[in-house]
């Protein structure tokens, strides 16, 4: 189909498949990075964004994209989050990985670790705290308890490790959030933020960089966690994993995260108007 049509008949028959004409895709080899696939992935995302803007659909659920493929096609986006933020012209967005028993949001994501400190600002940390608070309040209907990780080992050990990022950037952002009435604790050492005891006490963890949160959430909820773009003027969820080209067409991929992404988007569509 060239245009999505939603009706009782199409719903009963299954989902409508919308084709986006792109470059010739006949030469695609499963499990291989190709620029033509990156181009197609971007075009399908842009089509979904277009349909959402005209209110033809209530939300967007994306499967993983291969960053190397979209770079090969000439697009500069390090991931979906940046593409969607640009297209919806939303300046304050962040990634949250969410499951019922664990959730974390990220101040920085797909950048080299040598660049993390360049992108770490008190304003950005405060924005992510606010976005996380508002999102969990919407999803769960309660005031969330948030835990903020430090950047350095032992959360800086009172300035002995790092360049006092905890003291100069993270703590002021936490204090700003508290003045707004948010329930925020931190900064704490990241190696204790995801213990069973901590997860019972807090609803979400604010992480300073990618692996600080992705490693624990994928160990605990790999097949259940959902990637949610916070701050968008539209609903967008996704899986919490990559393209897994190494097992393409083997039947080994676990669809659990995708199922949860669909469920969360559907539930949010009933709440967000």
Regions found by a protein language model. Give the residues of each.
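Active-site glycine-rich loop that binds ribose-phosphate moieties when present
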Residues: 82-86, 90-91, 111-137
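Flexible loop/hinge segments that line or gate small-molecule binding clefts
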Residues: 75-105, 109-112
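Contiguous, glycine/small-aliphatic-enriched amphipathic segments in soluble metabolic enzymes
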Residues: 1-80, 123-208, 212-227, 232-237, ...
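Amphipathic alpha-helix from the class-I
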Residues: 109-116, 156, 250
């Amino acid at each position: 189909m060239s245009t999505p049509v939603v009706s009782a008949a199409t719903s009963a028959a299954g989902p409508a498949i919308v084709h986006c004409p792109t470059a010739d895709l006949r030469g695609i080899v499963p499990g291989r990075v190709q620029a033509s696939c990156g181009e197609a992935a971007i075009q399908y995302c842009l089509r979904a964004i277009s349909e959402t803007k005209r209110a033809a659909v209530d939300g967007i659920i994306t499967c993983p994209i291969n960053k190397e493929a979209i770079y090969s096609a000439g697009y500069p986006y390090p991931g979906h989050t940046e593409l969607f933020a640009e297209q919806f012209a939303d300046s304050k967005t962040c990634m949250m990985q969410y499951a019922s028993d664990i959730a974390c949001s990220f101040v920085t994501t797909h950048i080299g670790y040598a660049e993390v400190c360049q992108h770490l600002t008190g304003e950005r940390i405060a924005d992510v705290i606010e976005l996380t608070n508002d999102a969990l309040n919407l999803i769960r209907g309660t005031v969330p308890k948030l835990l903020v990780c430090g950047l350095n080992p032992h959360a800086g050990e009172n300035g002995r490790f790092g360049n006092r990022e905890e003291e100069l950037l993270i703590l002021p952002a936490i204090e700003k959030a508290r003045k707004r009435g948010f329930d925020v604790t931190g900064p704490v050492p990241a190696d204790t933020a995801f213990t069973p005891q901590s997860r019972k006490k807090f609803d979400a963890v604010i992480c300073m960089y990618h692996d600080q949160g992705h490693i624990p959430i994928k160990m605990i909820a790999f097949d259940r966690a959902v990637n949610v773009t916070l701050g968008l003027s539209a609903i967008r969820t996704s899986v919490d994993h990559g393209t897994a080209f190494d097992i393409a067409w083997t039947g080994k991929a676990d669809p659990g995260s995708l199922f949860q992404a669909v469920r969360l988007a559907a539930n949010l569509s009933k709440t967000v108007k």
